[in-house]
Amino acid sequence: MRLDAEVSFDLKELFGVDKPAVAMAHLPPMPGTPLYDETAGPAAIVESVARDVEHLVGAGFDAILFCNEGDRPYQLQASLEGVAMMARVVAEVAPSDRPFGVDYLWDPQAALAVAAVTGASFIREVATGAYESDMGLWAPDAGKLLRYRRELDAEHVAVFMNITPEFASTVGTRDIATTARSVRVSSLADAILVSGPMAGAEPSVDAVREAKRGCGDETPVFANTGVKSSNVKDFLAVADGAVVGSDLKVDGGTWNPVDPERASRFMTEVRAVRESL
């Protein structure tokens, strides 16, 4: 538990390496959502994610991040059946030999609840700021989230905060460096994430650099979307780690299954970066 906002979160203690690569395990549409395949049922969701996780672990990713990417259009409050389905998937297929995390689009408390009961090490969420978004006006509450973490006795679950969320734009005027520093200090982020405008869309390297300037060495910064085998070297030259999803999929499509060859190619590039450190 962080008692002092100036105490750096130990990224290497969690992931075991410098410049960790976190791979997305995207859940297909879950029960109750518009694209859910009720004929295939919940078992098909578990089987799909299990196959992807097997490929990602085989490629050597340092951690797996489970996310309900298939639940379009997204909502700001999770459904009971969605939380139950995600908890089932994570409990059944999470790897036992490396860290894993949870991201519930776009409900931080739901992500934390699933993480707490499944043994996850971290969550990724938008927890601060105010936005105009595809889901309407959006104003998450970091204070509520971290108090809920205390209620659950889940302070071992790190909170990675995305400060430039996909499918949204901020209504504020602060620059990225100022925002990153403020979120680090006032909202006690364990890590800061910088995203592009949509899933699979890359942020600028300069945006990641600015977030890092705001955080210094106190809080790690991740490139959160759009990282590819072709650009991961550029991002990891600035960022402390990377989250990747779309580039690992068949034809680079966000909602496609994982392509083992693309996953292996990505990790080959990451290892080359580490060897150059």
Predicted segments — roles?
Residues 61-85, 130-134, 189-203, 251-253:
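Glycine-rich, proline-tolerant flexible connector loops at the mouths of alpha/beta enzymes
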Residues 21-25, 64-66, 100-102, 123-125, ...:
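Hydrophobic faces of well-ordered beta-strands that scaffold small-molecule active sites
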Residues 173-192, 199-218, 230:
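Short loop-to-alpha-helix "cap/lid" segments that border enzyme active sites
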Residues 27-33, 114-191:
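Conserved anion-binding
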Residues 23, 75-102, 140-161, 203-228, ...:
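Alpha-helix-loop-beta-strand connector modules within alpha/beta enzyme cores
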Residues 26-50, 100-107, 161-177, 222-228:
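Active-site mouth loops of central-metabolism enzymes
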Residues 1-42, 146, 150-151:
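N-terminal amphipathic alpha-helix/helix-capping segment at the start of soluble metabolic enzymes
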Residues 107-119, 178-179, 211, 217, ...:
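Catalytic cores of alpha/beta
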